[in-house]
Curated annotation (Swiss-Prot):
Activity modulation: Inhibited by barbituric acid.
Catalytic activity: cyanurate + H2O = 1-carboxybiuret + H(+)
Organism this protein belongs to: Pseudonocardia dioxanivorans (strain ATCC 55486 / DSM 44775 / JCM 13855 / CB1190)
Full protein name: Cyanuric acid amidohydrolase
Active site: 146, 215 (nucleophile)
Amino acid sequence: MTVVDIVKRTTSSPDDTALVKTLADAGYSTADVVALVAKTEGNGCVNDFSRTLADHTWDAVLPADAVTVFSGGTEGVLSPHASAFVGTDRPAAPEGALVAAVGRTASIPIADLGRAGQVRAVAARVRELCADAALEPGDVHLVLVKCPLLTTESISRCLADGVEPATRDTLRSMAMSRAASALGVAVALGEISEPDAAAALRGEADVWSSVASISSGAELDDCHILVLGNSPAAHGPLRAVHGVMRDAMDARTVLDLLDRVSADGGEVVQVLAKAEADPSGSIRGRRHTMLTDSDLSSTRHARAAVGGLLAGLVGDSAIYVSGGAEHQGPPGGGPVTVVYRVAS
């Protein structure tokens, strides 16, 4: 179990490491970082090399056992930024605190990506991390996963081995990898059963996790996992609450979370949310065009829409909004987690 604090800073480019100085100013160092979660200013799709640049830059700075989640796409009012989750033992509130557990899966075989093998790998690792942090499923407020995707090269290797990959479409592989990882989280936390997950992979079950936030990228071949939960046994500066937005306009869910933060005397530090274009093609009975825009991926539209809503409600544009919410909340919606600071 690691009690954590968050140090956040906006970035001027994907390779901006000014957060290192901000950490020092706050009395921390890079050695204290257990996870780095950032939004980079790329397109969030397969060829988003802003993630790769950020990953390459920070890999030389952070401890070897720290996990990184670089999510591309800062459309609309979203600000590129980085949040360092740091271990802390500073004096804190007397009861209950946010703790983190971080880890990685083994490399996901190309043939397993988007399939049951990936579900099992993520589920097993999430279970281990929850046990390490002494977190029950009800204590967990976010499971953030960065997972791999299929590239042209990896697809070719798979075919050369005589194995058909889950898809030959690199963009579709992003969604399939997110889906498998989300289902793994849901299985690990008892939100769904393994047969439910198998049915969902076949498109036969509409099941989802209320705390999974999954992003995929070409900069890794394993899954980086960050589990956040409130531990009644821990003392620390932060706590978290979470809810599930029913659609991209669901301000009520967010306002309810902010009311809970206020009732606890808290100050919002970070918001982490998933967003997607409603696959039905409509929102509350009105047609939307996010799925039929040939110029922009629907994930970019969704990030801009949900990012604007959340930034307006919270009063901060340096928030984490990730597009593509397959099995992460209901269709068209997505989980949202608010991390806040409490008085010591």
